[in-house]
């Protein structure tokens, strides 16, 4: 039986498992090492920068359940550098070790419409948006947003991938096909002035806190620079922190959560 409320202290037995071997996995491993933890990386074979800085590596696919079981038995907990881990993989790992954050959180982060619904439930505002299942939905929703929107696949996609800007000259049928004719969300395009990020952590013993709020600067939809702490008045800071804690409660969340606000 896994006791998910016990703190995981740095020692030879308490190895942190990391899912994904990219740059974020590397940063997790480096941070863990500074705190005295050993790390065990699980990722498909390939060009994985995180492999250079961990104590142990298992190369396997996300559906290689034999390797996943062996990996889970070697670690005190497992976390991930990205959200798109298959649910069956997470369910298997959760049966043998403490997966942080939980499968519920991963599922919410994997589906944009669920993310938006959770944000609204927690008190955050979102741009107007519509769930798009076919071209009829797309035509109707685009008209509602005055042909000024962004169409995104409901799952996957990042750094500007898996999305298209919609305007008066857009060929909606062509764009729909380019995105694979899969379920999408259509978001109102906002003319925003600033982007602020808030990062909140909460441990299984309910110790929590915030990193300094930061301001992000992008070029062509890709992050170029972050400045911390961001210059914000205390009223806005307190409001953001309150809503972030509410989001954490709604997700029964443990770990570190980051939210981008515009």
Model-derived features with residue positions:
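CheY-like receiver
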Residues: 70-71, 118, 141-144, 175-178
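Internal nucleotide-binding/catalytic subdomain
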Residues: 162, 166-262
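Structural detector of well-ordered beta-strand residues that form the stable sheet scaffold
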Residues: 40, 79, 99-101, 127, ...
């Amino acid at each position: 039986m896994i006791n998910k409320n016990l703190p995981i202290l740095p020692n030879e037995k308490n190895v942190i498992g990391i899912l994904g071997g990219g740059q974020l996995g590397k940063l997790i491993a480096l941070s863990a090492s500074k705190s005295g933890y050993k790390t065990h990386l699980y990722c498909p074979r390939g060009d994985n920068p995180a492999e250079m800085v961990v104590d142990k590596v298992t190369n396997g696919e996300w559906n290689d359940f034999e390797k996943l079981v062996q990996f889970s038995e070697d670690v005190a907990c497992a976390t991930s550098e990205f959200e798109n881990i298959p649910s069956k993989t997470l369910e298997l790992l959760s049966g043998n070790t403490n997966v942080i954050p939980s499968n519920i959180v991963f599922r919410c982060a994997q589906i944009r419409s669920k993310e938006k619904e959770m944000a609204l439930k927690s008190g955050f505002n979102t741009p107007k948006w519509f769930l798009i299942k076919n071209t009829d939905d797309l035509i109707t929703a685009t008209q509602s947003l005055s042909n000024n929107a962004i169409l995104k696949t409901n799952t996957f996609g990042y750094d500007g991938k898996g999305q298209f800007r919609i305007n008066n000259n857009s060929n909606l049928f062509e764009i729909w096909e380019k995105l694979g004719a899969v379920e999408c969300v259509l978001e109102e395009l906002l003319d925003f002035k600033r982007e602020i990020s808030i990062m909140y952590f909460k441990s299984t013993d309910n110790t929590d806190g915030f990193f300094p709020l930061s301001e992000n600067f992008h070029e062509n939809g890709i992050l170029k620079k972050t400045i911390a702490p961001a210059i914000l008045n205390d009223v806005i800071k307190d409001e953001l922190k309150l809503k972030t804690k509410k989001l954490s409660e709604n997700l029964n969340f443990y770990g570190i959560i980051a939210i981008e606000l515009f």
